[in-house]
A protein has these predicted regions:
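Flexible internal linker/loop segments at domain or repeat junctions
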Residues: 86-119
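Glycine-rich adenosyl-nucleotide cofactor-binding module
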Residues: 1-13
Length: 166
């Protein structure tokens, strides 16, 4: 296999969790895309804290790759801004509220024939709780509280509630 990367390390530099350990070596146990799309488990706390507001996937490594940017015939801009505008925050709150308040059937109907099906309703609810904790979205405290009795989400919901109170 040809090595097109040369000395480029843009993907390694941008990865929020340092999942790329060295050129072409990925530790999936640290990868946001793995945890938000593929995994059916709750990510470890140290990974969750680095997930920020990533609800589904990440792909920063793919976006900064010069070889991928050639496909777009222009340089893709990556924002260094890590805080949400007020309107972005409100939109995020509404989306997360929908995910947590909706039944699995309602979510499936909404995400049908989209890549979000890969995570499914259970994964999206898990991811929503993580985003709420990371972004300190106290406006959704009631929705988090409602998940405490859920067999899968309950332990995570309890941790998120503690985070929201601190």
């Amino acid at each position: 296999v040809s090595d097109f990367c040369g000395t480029c390390q843009k993907c390694m530099e941008i990865c929020p969790t340092q999942a790329l350990k060295s050129p072409r070596v990925l530790d999936a146990n640290l990868c946001i895309s793995y945890w938000t799309i593929e995994s059916r488990k709750i990510p470890p706390t140290e990974v969750r804290k680095k997930m920020g507001d990533w609800l589904f996937g990440c792909d920063l490594c793919q976006t900064v790759c010069p070889w991928n940017q050639k496909i777009y015939k222009s340089k893709l801009e990556i924002s260094e801004k890590r805080s949400l505008s007020e309107s972005d925050r409100e939109n995020l709150i509404q989306d997360l509220k929908f995910i947590l308040e909706s039944s699995n059937r309602q979510i499936l109907k909404k995400i049908e024939k989209t890549p979000l099906m890969r995570a499914g309703p259970k994964g999206l609810k898990r991811n929503a709780l993580i985003v709420i904790g990371n972004q300190k979205l106290v406006e959704l405290k009631n929705q988090v509280q409602q998940k405490i009795t859920d067999d899968f989400l309950g332990p995570l919901a309890k941790e998120i509630l503690i985070e929201l109170e601190n």
